[in-house]
């Protein structure tokens, strides 16, 4: 099945027809603080895309950057370097700050089952290619030097801002650029290389043809893409806040460098909303994964919440919404645990042998429906609804329900199999009427000292994979 994605560049759906080597790049975190769950909604969306691609048979090469230098507090060309600012406030080096928060980021990713990239690109380790890109653009007369900084001249790139709807002919159009740099020729121009930092204590600087300085955030992503993926990129991921500045600047840099169109598909995830605003570190209204854990939520409760909404829709966050997701996830696990506990060893063997060896047409129909939903712009929320339909179905066997749940979980990544087994370790097996009858027969046999019959019943349960445990409260059934 071919994957279709909503393409921000074309404002339409694009098909991904190349199955052999899909190059995907995601804008990763700026490591000056803990990533918040608003950030992680975007990374979960990226994770769902990567897993869906691989599920559908695409071979994927997935890279993510780590911004440890050059991302200013204003996100444009104003403000202080975020990592430097945090380092100074905490009395640590930039390297200590960036390494600590990079490790914290990937630790939270593991808790949320967010896939680790095939390649992690740390900005400060790729300075030579960034300088080389600026030199080439300078040779093409696309840059200018002003007040100690190298600027990109957006008037040289006629399609600048098309993805964001910026019209360069309209001289009053500044999109999100509020603070106008008086040293720019055009309102939409942006810095490629800083040598005249607005702050004298800039810790990380490198020598360049324009003097000691450091790269801009936009240059970093563009140059690292060129170094790792060369002249082609299939999919670029990010949040909707990247559209109007960062990604249009990346496009301008790379396409002027290559003299051709670059990256056909840009995909953007919407905000996580809290109190009618996007979650934001700068505003101080943000929650981390650790905060959720301290309130007795599993990170997978938040992942479940993200699965309930399409990535292009804003998702409202509240503790009530998260609690509802927690209850729903636990209910799903409990139901699936009941199905699993009811299986005999033969049925378990069938389930564990080959998940996609469908024995019934209904299984294949549900599987095909799931594929159809996720392959059309990652409609994972519809896939989740389909899973609930399967769980509640009266026409499917327990094996069929579990088989489909485990298959869907290859993308959803709720750890369903692991959670079921953990659940059964901590709880007694739910017994059906036939089991209850045999347990009662065994109790009577023991009372009548008919130990042969009692042992026969015990052995019958053992062959099914169960252990009978006699307690003061009665006989409990556990997995063997």
UniProtKB/Swiss-Prot annotation:
Instruction: Name the Gene3D superfamilies for this protein.
Output: Cysteine-tRNA ligase, C-terminal anti-codon recognition domain, HUPs
Which residues are recorded as binding Zn(2+)? 27, 221, 246, 250
Which gene is annotated as encoding this protein in its UniProt record? cysS
The entry's cellular-component GO terms read: cytosol
A molecular function annotated in GO for this UniProt entry is:
zinc ion binding
Motif, 'KMSKS' region: chain positions: 278-282
Entry protein name: Cysteine--tRNA ligase
Q: Origin organism of this chain?
A: Borreliella afzelii (strain PKo) (Borrelia afzelii)
Q: Name one Pfam family in it.
A: tRNA-synt_1e
Q: Which cofactor does it need?
A: Zn(2+)
EC class name:
ligase
PANTHER family (alphabetical)? CYSTEINE--TRNA LIGASE, CYTOPLASMIC (PTHR10890:SF3), CYSTEINYL-TRNA SYNTHETASE (PTHR10890)
Tell me the GO BP annotations in alphabetical order.
cysteinyl-tRNA aminoacylation
Q: Where is ATP bound in this sequence?
A: 281
